[in-house]
């Protein structure tokens, strides 16, 4: 029996169906892993931003910041004097249009229009806050008017303009680039540079970075809906992995993963996403992706069992046919021969039923693949494209925001790092570590998913009732789509982004290590001071015992003098330890700012590069699917 079973499994069609079933089983698990990885990555973005805000709230009072230097005005034409530079301390800059005064020089050229997504400078992004407001629409109208006015005045002009009364809500999310406190300079290459006129502390800068972490996380909401993440993630709690809860109630709320899902989430994003690109080829998504994959797996298991059963019937049928042939050659008894023939007919009937079951299962798989799976896959690619485009824009703005860190400096501080500050730094290190871990898992999950899907498609395109070399146009479409997707995922340079996050993790770990050294030095200083106070009290007691008029028994040994010498030595050591602690505090402050200044640009530049490549890769795959769908619609319209 075992030998017969082995012979059945060795059949090509059985082994093919077994491999198909195995690939689809992996696809079911890969889809679940992708959902979890996607959710955890979005959660990590929110958590890193929240941890940075909490960390900076403890660090900001220990730093002194200064305003950035005033930018020099653009070089004017020879006959025109340059406009006077603006004072860095001024809170607003008066703008006057060219129509209000003929004394002022003509206006400068307006900032260039926003470049395409592939550009490395997304100039207008810093002016776009997440929640739109009416005041910002007025600002855009004023900018458009100024642009039209300045178009005919030449490219070498310089001007100051005066806006209408600004409301408190008119400030940008990136407050350093606020409309009433900015200066735009234009060089010969027409590259607009925005310079902040406001001095900011670390807290304000980090809050802006956090806003775009939230924006990046919110961009994954439509894809979360497609992946049905709400039913996939169940391990939501307010506790960190170390099992600690922090005393600040606001911080506990920020670190609660449930709040990460709701904080700054825009409900309209999903509807905007669905209306963004239309429907590919007139198809609509039927059912959920999870349900579709599960049903495909159920049909693949049924198909495997039916094919395996059919092959066993074929083997029995061949044996019975051979038996009938031998009986006829031997001219055996009529009853035996007829019985064998009836067995053959029975097996043929069973084989016919089994073939119908195989065809039915195969048709159901094809139907699910055509009507549900392919439209869902196109929507997934569209969701990935939109998500990485938004993340590219968010990380690009963050790259510009963190440039303001170079305008911060530290002063020697005697204020030690508090325990809450140390805990917030440890939490930041943990969240950055989780960011790196979730990023690597997300990339791996995407690769495993498309690899399992492509492997299953490669085998499932084989038709049992057709020539295996013949493929329909639809089969070629879905297979070429997934192959292109597979190649795009393989070409993504995730190592660079991973190393960028690791470099930032190393910078944060350096701060943690320095704070730990400072804490140890503080303990040593406190211990030394405590010992000094104890010895000083003992010396005072000894001095009161041996008054100046009392004569010791032995003039060779004076206990007061010996004790005083020891106390003086201990005092020197205590002062030395105190000096070391103060120096350690200053080193901590300087290292904190230096590591942030060095680490932030690297990680955001790496993420900008990665998200840009992802955006372009998925856009290419999506556009290919869209063009194929449009071509097929055109063919349908041309056919009678």
From Swiss-Prot:
Disruption phenotype: Defects in primary root elongation and enhanced root hair elongation. It comes from the Eukaryota. It is found in: Nucleus. One of its GO terms (cellular component) is nucleus. Induction: Down-regulated by phosphate deficiency. Residues 336-371 form a coiled coil. Expressed in the root tip of primary and lateral roots, specifically in the meristematic region, including the quiescent center and lateral root cap cells. This is Protein ALTERED PHOSPHATE STARVATION RESPONSE 1. The gene is APSR1.
């Amino acid at each position: 029996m075992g030998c017969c079973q082995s012979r059945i499994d060795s059949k090509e069609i059985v082994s093919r169906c077994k491999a198909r079933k195995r690939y689809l089983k992996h696809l079911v698990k890969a889809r679940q892993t992708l959902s979890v990885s996607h959710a955890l990555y979005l959660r990590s973005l929110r958590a890193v931003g929240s941890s940075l805000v909490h960390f900076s709230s403890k660090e900001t009072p220990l730093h002194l910041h200064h305003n950035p230097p005033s930018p020099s005005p653009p070089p004017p034409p020879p006959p025109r004097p340059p406009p006077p530079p603006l004072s860095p301390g001024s809170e607003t800059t008066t703008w006057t249009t060219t129509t209000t005064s003929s004394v002022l020089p003509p206006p400068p050229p307006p900032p260039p229009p926003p470049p395409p997504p592939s550009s490395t400078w997304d100039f207008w992004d810093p002016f776009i806050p997440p929640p739109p407001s009416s005041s910002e629409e007025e600002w855009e109208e004023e900018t458009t008017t100024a642009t039209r006015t300045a178009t005919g005045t030449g490219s070498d002009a310089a001007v100051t303009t005066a806006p209408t009364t600004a409301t408190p809500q008119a400030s940008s999310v990136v407050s350093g680039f606020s409309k009433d406190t900015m200066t735009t300079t234009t060089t010969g290459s027409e590259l607009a540079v925005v310079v902040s006129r406001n001095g900011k502390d670390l807290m304000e800068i980090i809050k802006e970075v956090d806003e775009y972490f939230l924006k990046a996380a919110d961009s994954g909401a439509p894809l979360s809906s497609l992946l049905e993440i709400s039913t996939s993630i169940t391990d939501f709690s307010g506790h960190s992995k170390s099992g600690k809860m922090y005393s600040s109630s606001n911080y506990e709320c920020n670190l609660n993963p449930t709040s990460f899902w709701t904080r700054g989430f825009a409900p309209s994003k999903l509807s905007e996403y669905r209306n963004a690109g239309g429907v590919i080829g007139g198809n609509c998504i039927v059912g959920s992706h999870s349900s579709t994959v599960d049903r495909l797996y159920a049909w693949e298991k049924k198909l495997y069992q039916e094919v395996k059963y059919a092959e066993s019937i074929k083997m029995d049928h061949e044996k019975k046919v051979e038996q009938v042939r031998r009986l006829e050659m031997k001219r055996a008894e009529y009853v035996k021969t007829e019985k064998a023939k009836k067995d053959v007919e029975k097996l043929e009937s069973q084989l016919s039923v089994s073939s119908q079951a195989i065809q039915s299962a195969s048709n159901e798989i094809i139907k699910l693949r055509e009507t549900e799976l392919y439209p869902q896959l196109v929507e997934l690619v569209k969701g990935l494209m939109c998500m990485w485009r938004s993340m590219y824009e968010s990380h690009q703005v963050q790259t510009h925001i963190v440039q303001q860190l170079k305008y911060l400096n530290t002063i020697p501080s005697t204020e030690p790092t508090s325990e809450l500050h140390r805990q917030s730094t440890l939490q930041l290190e943990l969240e950055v570590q989780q960011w790196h871990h979730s990023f690597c898992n997300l990339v791996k999950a995407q690769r495993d998913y498309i690899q399992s899907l492509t492997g299953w498609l490669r085998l499932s395109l084989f038709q049992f009732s057709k020539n295996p070399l013949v493929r329909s146009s639809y089969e070629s479409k879905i297979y070429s789509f997934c192959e292109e997707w597979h190649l795009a995922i393989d070409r993504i340079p995730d190592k660079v982004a991973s190393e960028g996050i690791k470099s930032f993790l190393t910078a944060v770990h350096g701060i943690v290590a320095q704070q730990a050294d400072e804490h140890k030095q503080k303990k040593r200083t406190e211990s030394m001071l405590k010992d000094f106070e104890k010895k000083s009290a003992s010396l005072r007691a000894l001095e009161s015992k041996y008054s100046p008029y009392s004569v010791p028994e032995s003039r060779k040994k004076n206990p007061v003098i010996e004790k005083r010498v020891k106390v003086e030595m201990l005092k020197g050591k205590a002062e030395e330890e105190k000096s070391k602690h103060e120096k350690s505090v200053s080193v901590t402050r300087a290292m904190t700012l230096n590591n942030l200044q060095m680490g932030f640009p690297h990680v955001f530049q790496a993420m900008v590069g990665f998200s840009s490549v992802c955006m372009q890769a998925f856009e290419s795959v999506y556009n290919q699917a869209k063009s194929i769908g449009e071509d097929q619609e055109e063919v349908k319209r041309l056919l009678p």
